[in-house]
Curated annotation (Swiss-Prot):
Region (Disordered): 170-190
Physiological role: Binds galactosides.
Highest rank taxon of the organism: Eukaryota
Recorded GO MF terms: carbohydrate binding; galactoside binding
Record protein name field: Galectin-9B
Organism of derivation: Homo sapiens
UniProt keywords, alphabetically: Lectin, Repeat
Other information: The LGALS9-like proteins are encoded by a duplicated regions on chromosome 17; there are at least 3 genes coding for galectin-9-like proteins.
Keyword Cytoplasm among record annotations: no
InterPro entries: ConA-like_dom_sf, Galectin-like, Galectin_CRD
GO biological process terms held by the UniProt record: negative regulation of CD4-positive, alpha-beta T cell proliferation; negative regulation of type II interferon production; positive regulation of gene expression
Length: 356
């Protein structure tokens, strides 16, 4: 089955985890597994690229072991039988510490990056295009598993249902005429060009757009300088996603995520631990609009804990999920979406992954 776009991520999946890789693996495909090694007594974890869910046919078994000084086993399993092990006598992971693990599929091998550095190459023993499932088990906690297909090209809209390990439950839009949010700045929206759109099924049955035609930019650095500033390729448009993961500092007071259009801040998201609030706003010509603070539940960020933020752009608003749970919508006050092409992150956090 042809795969025409980047698959939506699995957010905060419980371990052990098995999930479908839509369309199977392809040359140039990139999978990022972001999480942390547990500091418990467990001594191993594994990431498996396999056919189906039985575990009898594993094209690539990546198995860090905190034993005998630490090493990583790579192997292949065919019809329930393991092949010869390949061992890397070096341990790039630490117990109790976060990691960013990236697998790049190439015609001859898997290339594995750990925290931004090439760790190992594993030459294919079976055809990689048979792989349609990723599994993770052992002594780890996951923030997300994301997918990138750099060969994405614009095609006629395709639709599919993407499973979430934790459903992102975005509320349905109210029927009838939508009320304008405060301080709406009128502007002419730019025409929407041909886009690959996949739909994601939420637990409550609503559908919302995901997977842009423009491949996302991914920055798999072990740590980011703060403040962190980068471009958003193509700007915002309906179905565009931005994903950030990191850890809140133990003594954090505030941090912010800004989506900018020139000198304007189209979207300002500002978790404030001193006020137990997540403030949202827009700044136009150095003048702030009215704040939005309402949340459906308690503050979604916790000092000293990791987090994953998913910002999904729709025609009328941004939908924001934290750790797989929808927390709010923010109606556009600057409506020329393609001009919103810069991401700024600052404050009391450590970033571990950014995808624009």
């Amino acid at each position: 089955m042809a795969f025409s776009g980047s698959q939506a991520p699995y957010l905060s999946p419980a371990v052990p985890f098995s999930g479908t890789i839509q369309g199977g693996l392809q040359d140039g495909f990139q999978i990022t597994v972001n999480g942390a090694v547990l500091s418990s007594s467990g001594t191993r974890f594994a990431v498996d690229f396999q056919t189906g869910f039985s575990g009898n046919d594993i094209a690539f078994h990546f198995n860090p072991r905190f034993e005998d000084g630490g090493y990583v086993v790579c192997n292949t399993r065919q019809k329930g039988r393991w092949g010869p092990e390949e061992r890397k006598m070096h341990m790039p992971f630490q117990k109790g510490m976060p990691f960013d693990l990236c697998f790049l599929v190439q015609s001859s091998d898997f290339k594995v990056m750990v925290n931004g550095s090439l760790f190992v190459q594993y030459f294919h023993r079976v055809p990689f295009h048979r792989v349609d499932t990723i599994s993770v088990n052992g002594s780890v906690q996951l923030s997300y598993i994301s997918f990138q297909n750099p060969r994405t090209v614009p095609v006629q809209p395709a639709f599919s249902t993407v499973p979430f390990s934790q459903p992102v439950c975005f509320p349905p839009r109210p029927r009838g005429r939508r009320q304008k949010p405060p301080s709406v700045r009128p502007a002419n929206p730019a025409p929407i060009t041909q886009t690959v759109i996949h739909t994601v099924q939420s637990a409550s049955g609503q559908m919302f757009s995901q997977t842009p035609a423009i491949p996302p930019m991914m920055y798999p650095h072990p740590a980011y300088p703060m403040p962190f500033i980068t471009t958003i390729p193509g700007g915002l448009y309906p179905s565009k996603s931005i994903i950030l993961s990191g850890t809140v500092l133990p003594s954090a007071q505030r941090f912010h995520i800004n989506l900018c259009s020139g000198s304007h801040i189209a979207f300002h998201m500002n978790p404030r631990f001193d006020e137990n609030a997540v403030v949202r706003n827009t700044q136009i010509n150095n003048s702030w609009g009215s704040e939005e603070r309402s949340l459906p539940r308690k503050m979604p960020f916790v000092r000293g804990q990791s987090f994953s933020v998913w910002i999904l752009c729709e025609a009328h608003c941004l939908k924001v999920a934290v750790d797989g749970q929808h927390v709010f919508e923010y109606y556009h006050r600057l409506r020329n979406l393609p001009t919103i092409n810069k991401l700024e992150v600052g404050g009391d956090i450590q970033l571990t992954h950014v995808q624009t």
